[in-house]
């Protein structure tokens, strides 16, 4: 039996990148005899699967790749994949000439070709359905990430994703259901559906396929034997119609946590961002969700200091935060991305003002979070345990996405058990199994 080669892979960015990395691992394992290592010095191949949503991950790429070049063993190859690869293409070689190949986010199915072709570059965006068929690998035996669509049509003025991942294309339901059945039959109780705008699923396919919407897809997945929990990211506020909210609130297998990316609470800024909805629409959908699904948790994304944002615009964002009281918030200062309309807007906000606004927003959300967490004391949740932690403890998620940790061993992994919360903290709720 031949000796397996070693693969070191670093994944930056979103859950879709995590799933892409899983596909890469499977392809290299099945076709090139690789296995994963966590030791860079042992690796025959070093891959960085990149993110380009903000500027910071791009800088991190070239910092990391330089470190890897110094640490790698003689003869090892370095590849750059993902969204930054899509954006920069062969420019990566100019900035890091020791990189051996570059694969865009829509080209990872070509990983074996790239590995065996000197200075290979592929960043084209096409709609070939053969690219949906990958080898199978899951980084967790307890849940499975499943892509249901690729690309994005929204063209938000600050976002580079449509340029790196292409137009929005839905993956045919038969392919999705086949992957779900396979994951569930191998023990994955939780299915995590991925897409840039999942609740716009079914609007466009690359070929002739049965037209179904996201609500119908959720229903079909919930009927698969072995599936006990369904999560998804990210839905778009524009497509949160009543049918979708009803399916979300009434389907007993859909986890009651919703990500609603606000970005801004100002109608003027939302218009400049080309988000497609108003503050009023967002509030209506979020408050309706709270009404029909009392145990729901809502998370959000917020960008402060988008070009042209005034004090009043920022106050509008703060007012939405006060109204909805998000259980989780991912907030950032606006990051200018090349080739996006917002990058050329003349009314950029001073960086000191941006920093103050972000601090104000995050400080208030911390206060809100403290109130939310405090209310969890003595509550009882069903927790799906997925992770071993230090000091003989295990961690998992509640049905509405709180992270819970309790005393326990490996035998609890993969089980759903009731836990009483005894010591709630901001980042994790500590409890006891009952």
UniProtKB/Swiss-Prot annotation:
Entry-linked InterPro entries: Elp3/MiaA/NifB-like_rSAM, Methylthiotransferase, Methylthiotransferase_CS, Methylthiotransferase_N, Methylthiotransferase_N_sf, MiaB_methiolase, rSAM, rSAM_horseshoe
Q: Which cofactors are reported in the record for this sequence? A: [4Fe-4S] cluster
The TRAM domain is annotated at: 374-434
A GO cellular-component term linked to this record: cytosol
Q: Where does [4Fe-4S] cluster 1 bind?
A: 14, 51, 83
Q: What SMART domains does the entry give? A: Elp3 (SM00729)
Q: Which SUPFAM superfamilies match?
A: Radical SAM enzymes
Cofactor comment text? Binds 2 [4Fe-4S] clusters. One cluster is coordinated with 3 cysteines and an exchangeable S-adenosyl-L-methionine.
Q: Where does [4Fe-4S] cluster 2 bind?
A: 152, 156, 159
Quick one: where is this thing mainly located? cytoplasm
Q: Which reaction does it catalyse?
A: N(6)-dimethylallyladenosine(37) in tRNA + (sulfur carrier)-SH + AH2 + 2 S-adenosyl-L-methionine = 2-methylsulfanyl-N(6)-dimethylallyladenosine(37) in tRNA + (sulfur carrier)-H + 5'-deoxyadenosine + L-methionine + A + S-adenosyl-L-homocysteine + 2 H(+)
Q: Which GO terms fall under molecular function for this chain's record?
A: 4 iron, 4 sulfur cluster binding; metal ion binding; N6-isopentenyladenosine methylthiotransferase activity
Q: What is its EC number?
A: 2.8.4.3
Q: What class of enzyme is it?
A: transferase
Domain Radical SAM core, which positions?
138-371
Q: Which residues form the MTTase N-terminal domain?
A: 5-120
Localization recorded for this chain is: Cytoplasm
Keywords, ordered alphabetically: 4Fe-4S, Cytoplasm, Iron, Iron-sulfur, Metal-binding, S-adenosyl-L-methionine, Transferase, tRNA processing
Q: Pfam families, per this entry?
A: Radical_SAM (PF04055), TRAM (PF01938), UPF0004 (PF00919)
Oligomer and partners: Monomer.
Question: What functional role does this protein have?
Answer: Catalyzes the methylthiolation of N6-(dimethylallyl)adenosine (i(6)A), leading to the formation of 2-methylthio-N6-(dimethylallyl)adenosine (ms(2)i(6)A) at position 37 in tRNAs that read codons beginning with uridine.
Family (UniProt): Belongs to the methylthiotransferase family. MiaB subfamily.
| Protein's UniProt name | tRNA-2-methylthio-N(6)-dimethylallyladenosine synthase
Question: Species lineage, top-down?
Answer: Bacteria, Pseudomonadati, Campylobacterota, Epsilonproteobacteria, Campylobacterales
């Amino acid at each position: 039996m031949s000796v397996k080669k070693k693969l070191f892979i670093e994944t930056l960015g979103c859950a879709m990148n995590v799933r892409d990395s899983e596909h890469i691992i499977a392809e290299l394992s099945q076709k090139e005899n690789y296995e994963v290592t966590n030791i860079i010095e042992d690796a025959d191949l070093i891959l960085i699967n990149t993110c380009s949503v903000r500027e910071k991950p791009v800088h991190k790429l070239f910092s990391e790749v330089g470190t890897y070049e110094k640490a790698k063993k003689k003869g090892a190859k370095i590849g750059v994949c993902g969204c930054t690869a899509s954006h920069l293409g062969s420019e990566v070689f100019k900035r890091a000439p020791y990189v051996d190949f570059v694969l865009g986010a829509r080209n990872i199915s070509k990983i074996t070709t790239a590995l065996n072709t000197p200075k290979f570059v592929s960043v084209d965006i096409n709609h070939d359905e053969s690219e949906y068929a990958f080898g199978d690998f899951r980084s967790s035996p307890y849940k499975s990430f499943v892509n249901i669509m690729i690309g994005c049509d929204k063209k938000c003025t600050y976002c580079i994703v449509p340029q790196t991942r292409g137009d929005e294309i839905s993956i045919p339901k038969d392919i999705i259901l086949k992957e779900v059945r396979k994951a569930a039959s191998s023990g994955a109780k939780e299915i995590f559906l991925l897409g840039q705008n999942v609740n716009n699923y079914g609007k466009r396919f690359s070929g002739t396929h049965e037209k179904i919407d996201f609500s119908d897809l959720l229903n079909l997945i919930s009927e698969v034997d072995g599936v006990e929990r369904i999560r998804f990211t990210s839905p778009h506020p524009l497509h949160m119609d009543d049918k979708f909210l009803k399916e979300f609130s009434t389907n007993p297998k859909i986890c009651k946590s919703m990500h609603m990316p606000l970005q801004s609470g100002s109608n003027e800024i939302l218009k400049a961002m080309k988000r497609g909805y108003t503050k009023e629409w967002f509030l209506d959908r979020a408050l309706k969700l709270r009404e029909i699904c009392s145990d729901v948790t809502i998370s959000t994304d917020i960008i402060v200091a988008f070009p042209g944002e005034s004090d009043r615009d920022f106050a509008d964002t703060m007012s939405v935060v006060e109204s909805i009281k998000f259980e989780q918030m991912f907030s950032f200062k606006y990051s200018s991305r090349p080739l996006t309309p917002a990058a050329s807007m003349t009314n950029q906000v001073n960086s000191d003002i941006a920093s103050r606004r972000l601090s104000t927003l995050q400080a208030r959300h911390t206060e809100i979070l403290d109130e939310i967490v405090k209310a969890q004391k003595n509550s009882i949740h069903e927790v799906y345990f997925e992770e071993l932690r230090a000091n003989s403890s295990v961690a998992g998620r509640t049905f509405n996405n709180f992270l819970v940790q309790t005393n326990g061993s490996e035998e609890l992994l993969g089980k759903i058990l009731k836990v009483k919360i005894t010591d709630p903290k901001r980042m994790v709720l500590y409890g006891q199994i009952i």
